Amino acid sequence: MTKLYYEDQYMKEFKGEIIEVKELDGKFHILLEQTAFFPGGGGQMGDLGLIDGIKVLDVYEEEGKVYHVLEKEPKKLKNLQCELDWERRFDGMQQHLGQHLLSGCFYDLFGANTCGFHLGKEISTVDIVGFLDEKTIREAEKEANRLIFENLEVKSYAPSKKELKKVKTRRALPKTEEEIRIVEIVGLDLNACCGVHPRNTRDLQVIKIRRWEKHKNATRIEYVAGNRAVGDFFTKDEILGEICKLLKSGEGDTLNAVKNLLENNKNLVDENRKVKAEIGNYKIKEMLNKSERIGSITLVNEVFDGEDTKHIGKLANKITEEYEAIVLFAVKNGDRVNLIFNSSKDIKKVNMSDILKDTITLIDGRGGGNQFAAQGGGKNNGNTEVAIDYATNKIRNILI
């Protein structure tokens, strides 16, 4: 069979003739005498589209033959109208060439080789050996975009075994008896690859590195190329426009406006923290003044409504750290209630975990802790006051 995708990678439609049909699991696997449907390979996704108006669900290669998986069997065998999902194909070509271009630039500029890549449906990644800094990454990105506008020719061919011995690729050739195809960005990169690529770098349009991270002994670089990069630009431009409206600033002033906003927010957070601490200290004094004393121990109990549980927990810790005290707090929020039981570490007679376990059944809850601190929550906040009174009486009986 003839693989048209290697002869003309820009072919969007063609006429086909069926030479074999296999029915497997209710689907029809069609072999044509020629096809422009790329079955996938080299990390690149395979083509989809239509054959005789029937949706192509998958394309795969088996023993050198390219099969097309269809929902139903075509009614005729010859002169079938075959159409590729061109947007999908061209996107795959752009992302794949983008990987070759970035890999070539990193190797050409810094001698850094590629140790892996992934061509995804939304974003793609390339792994470059070593840990690269931002300056290095941006330099490679700029060089890649410069070469796009240089309109370098991209060649794809399958040398004979004799010719392969003279080919010097960026990475070692795979050891196989099968045909090895070469993709060459003229003047930059030469590598083994069975994928389908644009004829020149200009068809790549633009390439944008979005972010990067350390990955094992390499730097994993996330990028978008071609139409994806253009779409990414428009999306970010729209977002920037909305941010400018919210900040009431021009694009050039956006960064400073955000910095000022963050600084003002930090100041407000600091001020709010100080106010909360002052209110907390006042609240602690108020609770201590009205609390019951059993010998040298102050027994503090309180029910809060709509308060932040973490904040109330901090108040409990502060009281038991600064005073010889036992704290029994309940915090109602909606239908739920949280119990926070604490005691000073020099009070050995009372185990807060045991007190909580006995009490929490009254609010249909669960919880746990240790001798000096225990917490839990339940869904029956109608029994909150009963639960606190029950725990208070248990502690009285232990201490008196």
PLM regions: where:
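Conserved nucleotide-binding/hydrolysis modules and their immediate coupling elements
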Residues: M1-K78
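Functional cores that coordinate and move charged inorganic groups
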Residues: R88, D108-H215, I400
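Glycine-rich, acidic loop segments that terminate in or are immediately followed by a histidine
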Residues: C193-L204, N301-I400
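Hydrophobic helix-and-loop "lid/oligomerization" segment in the mid-to-C-terminal part
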Residues: E238-D335
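A conserved active-site cap/scaffold subdomain adjacent to cofactor or substrate pockets
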Residues: P198, R210-A257
